[in-house]
């Protein structure tokens, strides 16, 4: 294993999301309790918290208002190694585990969900290469994300007719000699228009259903890759969601991820991790709104005293804080299980995504209510957080779908 990755004064050397090795003292070390952090994790989170407050928070309103991609944050993340969080150290990445990266996303989500989503989608775009790629494919692509690289990735699965029902996708990949020719369309692809490297799902044999889907790595500049328009969104406007078109696009056979026909299994595996990242972002949004609401109640005076002294306000704040804490603990349990490769990880992860995103929607709505007219105004930012929270109930699987999957898993475990 190569030497440690440095975050300024902080040195970290850990095992990645995929490593089966264990180290005695690493950022990814598991403790006996879910809440206890290693010293390295504490230092990392202090650094991320300072970065979020000083560099990201002041730009959040502008990013939302202007639909501006957070270039400044991307460059800072690149300098700190945060653009390759899950890439194993031996490939030049940071080598974080799922739990640590989830905590990073929560901290950034507190101040700017667009920036958190950009970083989340960056990790998602690499997941299938890390989890399922051959050694040759990993060697070809993963080192390119090290050394302060600003290369961006995207996870391209959703199509106009294939959202919750991903088996309905129409994109096709036909093998011709030592290449695959891809034709089709993707939509709502997070980071799509800024991505340099895409992981793309397509059917290689539609007659086989789930066993006929495969995964490919596609690079920007490949003839036949066409970037469509960016969507105008309700929230998280700084992170683009884009159309992608593939017109007789040729990729070398070596860019097949894993084995042909196993793409759907790879997709489900990646989504089980994506969902806990979404949940972590949701907890961050909720925490950020809660903190702003609490501060407002201490400063806003009505009836001759701060509204924090009013019992109805105290009840609302108590419920909001309880719900956020419960969501955080459920997310931590899910990430801990996923890091341990426990078979319950995907089940608890789905629960965490559902509960945390519903919590974010409720808490941000209540934050607007607690702050009254001020909460409805842009400068106080909780209205933005309310709009951002909505997406967490939709992406990586709507909460109706995640509830259905959870229910089936509990009732029919076989």
From Swiss-Prot:
The active site is at residue 124. Its EC number is 1.3.8.10. One of its GO terms (molecular function) is oxidoreductase activity, acting on the CH-CH group of donors, with a flavin as acceptor. It is an enzyme of class 1 (oxidoreductase). Pfam families: Acyl-CoA_dh_1, Acyl-CoA_dh_M, Acyl-CoA_dh_N. Keywords: FAD, Flavoprotein, Oxidoreductase. InterPro entries: Acyl-CoA_DH_CS, Acyl-CoA_Oxase/DH_mid-dom, Acyl-CoA_Oxase/DH_mid-dom_sf, AcylCo_DH-like_C, AcylCo_DH/oxidase_C, AcylCoA_DH/ox_N, AcylCoA_DH/ox_N_sf, AcylCoA_DH/oxidase_NM_dom_sf. This is Cyclohex-1-ene-1-carbonyl-CoA dehydrogenase. It comes from Syntrophus aciditrophicus (strain SB).
């Amino acid at each position: 294993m190569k030497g440690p990755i440095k975050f300024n004064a902080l040195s970290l050397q850990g095992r990645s999301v995929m490593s089966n090795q264990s180290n005695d003292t690493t950022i990814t070390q598991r403790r006996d309790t879910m809440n206890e952090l290693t010293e390295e994790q504490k230092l990392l989170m202090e650094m991320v918290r300072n970065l979020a407050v000083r560099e990201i928070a002041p730009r959040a309103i502008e990013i939302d208002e202007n639909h501006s991609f957070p270039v400044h944050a991307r460059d800072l993340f690149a300098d700190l190694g945060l653009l390759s969080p899950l890439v194993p150290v031996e490939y030049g990445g940071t080598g974080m585990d799922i739990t640590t990266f989830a905590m990073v996303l929560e901290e950034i989500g507190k101040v700017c969900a667009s920036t958190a989503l950009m970083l989340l989608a960056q990790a998602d775009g690499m997941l299938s290469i890390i989890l399922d790629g051959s050694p040759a494919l990993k060697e070809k692509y993963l080192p390119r994300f090290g050394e302060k690289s600003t290369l961006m990735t995207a996870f391209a699965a959703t199509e106009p007719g294939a959202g919750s029902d991903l088996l309905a996708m129409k994109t096709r990949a036909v093998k011709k000699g030592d290449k695959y020719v891809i034709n089709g369309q993707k939509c709502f692809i997070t980071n799509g228009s800024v991505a340099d490297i895409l992981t793309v799902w397509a059917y290689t044999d539609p007659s086989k259903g789930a066993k006929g889907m495969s995964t490919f790595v596609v690079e920007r500049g490949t003839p036949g890759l066409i970037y469509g328009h960016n969507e105008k969104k309700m929230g998280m406007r700084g992170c683009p969601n884009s159309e992608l078109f593939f017109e007789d696009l040729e990729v070398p056979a070596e860019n097949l991820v894993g084995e042909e026909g196993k793409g759907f299994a790879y997709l489900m595996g990646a989504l089980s991790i994506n969902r806990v990242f979404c949940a972590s972002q949701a907890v961050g949004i909720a925490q950020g709104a809660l903190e702003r609401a609490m501060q407002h109640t201490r400063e806003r005076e009505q009836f001759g005293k701060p509204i924090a002294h009013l019992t109805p306000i105290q009840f609302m704040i108590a419920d909001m804080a309880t719900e956020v804490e419960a969501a955080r603990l459920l997310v931590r349990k899910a990430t801990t299980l996923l890091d341990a490769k426990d078979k319950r990880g995907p089940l608890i992860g789905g629960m965490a995504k559902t509960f945390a995103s519903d919590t974010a929607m409720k808490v941000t709505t209540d934050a607007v209510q607690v702050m009254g007219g001020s909460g409805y105004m842009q400068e106080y930012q909780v209205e933005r957080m309310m709009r951002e929270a909505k997406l967490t109930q939709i992406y990586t699987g709507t909460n109706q779908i995640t509830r259905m999957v959870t229910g089936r898993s509990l009732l029919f475990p076989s």
